[in-house]
Amino acid sequence: MNLIAKLEQEEIERALAGKTIPEFAPGDTVIVNVNVVEGNRKRVQAYEGVVIAIRNRGLNSNFIVRKISSGEGVERTFQTYSPLLASIVVKRRGDVRRAKLYYLRERSGKSARIKEKLVSKDRTAAASQE
């Protein structure tokens, strides 16, 4: 491992100190809690939507979440290892066959729905035992 990769790995570990980032994939509905500073006040803002893309680039990894806000599509890019991210909660698993769901931008209503991924009972029991 070269020096840059080693430094990057140390920064990732420092960013994850005390935080856990759950496994999520494109198509999943997530709730991203973001620390927002307004003047001298700090609060947590929740942003819920569908993950349409994940970009894995080490420390520069990010993901795009899309939601419909009052009839208008809104996309927001989050840095995976940002100190502004308070937490990420996976609300629903989506069953998709693409890594990038940019086609959802042109769709609205029922055609923009994503099927839910059904997890078998064996996997659920194994996951709860771990």
From Swiss-Prot:
Instruction: Cite the InterPro entries for this sequence.
Output: Ribosomal_bL19, Ribosomal_bL19_CS, Ribosomal_bL19_sf, Translation_prot_SH3-like_sf
What Pfam families does the record tag this protein with? Ribosomal_L19 (PF01245)
Cellular component aspect of the GO annotation: cytosolic large ribosomal subunit
Q: Name one GO biological process term.
A: translation
GO MF term set: structural constituent of ribosome
Q: Which residues are connected by disulfide bridges in this protein? A: none
Record's keyword annotation contains Ribosomal protein: yes
Q: Which UniProt keywords apply?
A: Ribonucleoprotein, Ribosomal protein
The superkingdom listed in its UniProt entry is Bacteria
Could you tell me which PANTHER family the record lists for this protein?
LARGE RIBOSOMAL SUBUNIT PROTEIN BL19M, RIBOSOMAL PROTEIN L19
**What family does the Swiss-Prot or TrEMBL record give for this protein?**
Belongs to the bacterial ribosomal protein bL19 family.
Stated role:
This protein is located at the 30S-50S ribosomal subunit interface and may play a role in the structure and function of the aminoacyl-tRNA binding site.
- The identity of this protein, by name, is Large ribosomal subunit protein bL19
**Which source organism?**
Burkholderia vietnamiensis (strain G4 / LMG 22486) (Burkholderia cepacia (strain R1808))
Q: What is the lineage of its organism?
A: Bacteria, Pseudomonadati, Pseudomonadota, Betaproteobacteria, Burkholderiales
